[in-house]
Amino acid sequence: MVVVRLARGGAKKRPFYSMVVADSRNRRDGKFIERVGFYNPRATGGEESLRIQMDRLTYWQSKGAQLSDTVSRLVKQFGRQQKAAQPQE
């Protein structure tokens, strides 16, 4: 089964996660098919903490990819950020 999940990177005590599309049988930080975004939980100041390529994510979902619990929570958060960033008319 194809799954969209987070792969951990970064240094010790300084996590950085890549949002990847991978086969569920592969290791968390192992081989993946495509990188569709990132999540930086320790972003400070003007650093970007979350970026998702929504077009690629919807493509993989249409192909049957399942989102992990954490990724689905981050997608909802990203949607709220995008909605807040759009100018009100």
UniProtKB/Swiss-Prot annotation:
InterPro entries: Ribosomal_bS16 (IPR000307), Ribosomal_bS16_CS (IPR020592), Ribosomal_bS16_dom_sf (IPR023803). GO terms for biological process: translation. One of its GO terms (molecular function) is structural constituent of ribosome. The keyword Methyltransferase does not apply. GO terms for cellular component: cytoplasm; small ribosomal subunit. The keyword Protein transport does not apply. It comes from the Bacteria. Keywords: Ribonucleoprotein, Ribosomal protein. Belongs to the bacterial ribosomal protein bS16 family. NCBIfam families: S16. This is Small ribosomal subunit protein bS16. The gene is rpsP.
